[in-house]
Amino acid sequence: MGRSFEVRKASMAKTQGAKIKVYSKYGKEIYMCAKNGGADPDMNLSLKHLISKAKKDQVPAHVIDKALDKATGGGGEDYQHARYEGFAPGGASVIVDCLTDNGNRTFQDVRQCFVKTGAKIGSPGTSAHMFDHQAVFQFKGDDEEAVLEALMMQDADVTDIELEDGVITVFAPNTEFFKVKTALAAEYPDLVLDVEEITFVPQNHTPVTGEDAEKFQKFLDMLDDCDDVQQVYHNAELED
C-alpha cells in the first residue's frame, strides 16, 4: 500500500495529575471489558490484551485489580461507547472515542474542544471513511519478506507490511488481531512487540502548519483533559 505508519506514543506522564488520567482511562476500559466479556483474561482475549497494554503503560496492578473487582461485584456505572467525528484545525480528519455514563455531558465537553479551537464536529461517518480500522504490530527486524512468508504459513491475513530503519510494521484487518499475534508468537517465540494495537490508520495525511498547528495542539490538549475521552485518531502531518 506504500503507506508510512508513524506511531505517535505520548511520553510517560510527567505529572501526577496526568498519570491519574491515564490510570482512570484504563480502569474504565478494563471495567467495561470485564463486565461485558467476563473477568477471566484467559477466557476474554480482549481483556487479556487490554491488561497487557495497561501494564506496558505502567498502570499499577492495584488499578487493574480494582477495575476487575468492580466488574465482578455487580452494580457500578454503566458506561456507553460514544464516537465523534469531524475536522480538526487545519482540516485534518479526526475521530474521538469516548466511554461515558452521561452522553449529553460528554457531547458538550467534546463539542467545546471543537468550537474553541475553530474545529468542526460532524455527523457519524464524516471522517471514519478516511481511515482503515486495522491491527498493527511493530517490532525490530530487517527481513519483512521472511515475516510475511511466516505469517502466510500460519494462514494469517495481512494487508500490508513495511520495513523502515530496522523496524517492521505489520498491518492486518482489525478482526485478525489475535490470529496475527498468535502467529507471530508461534513463528518467533522470543519476539518483543513494541506496538500491538487495534487502531485507525489514516489512508492519507493532511499537512497542518503555522497557526493551525498551534490550534491543533491546543485541540488535542483539550481533548486529553476530557475525562470521558479514551482515544483520539487523526491524519494530521505536523512539522518537526
Swiss-Prot record:
Record-linked SUPFAM superfamilies: YebC-like
InterPro entries: Integrase-like_N, TACO1_YebC-like_2nd/3rd_dom, TACO1_YebC_N, Transcrip_reg_TACO1-like, Transcrip_reg_TACO1-like_dom3, YebC-like
Keywords: Cytoplasm, DNA-binding, Transcription, Transcription regulation
Residues spanning the signal sequence: none
Principal location class: cytoplasm
Protein location: Cytoplasm
Top-level taxon: Bacteria
Keyword DNA-binding (UniProt): yes
Gene Ontology MF terms: DNA binding
One of the GO biological process terms: regulation of DNA-templated transcription
GO CC, alphabetical: cytosol
Family under the similarity heading: Belongs to the TACO1 family.
Protein name as annotated: Probable transcriptional regulatory protein VF_A0150
Organism: Aliivibrio fischeri (strain ATCC 700601 / ES114)
Upper lineage: Bacteria, Pseudomonadati, Pseudomonadota, Gammaproteobacteria, Vibrionales
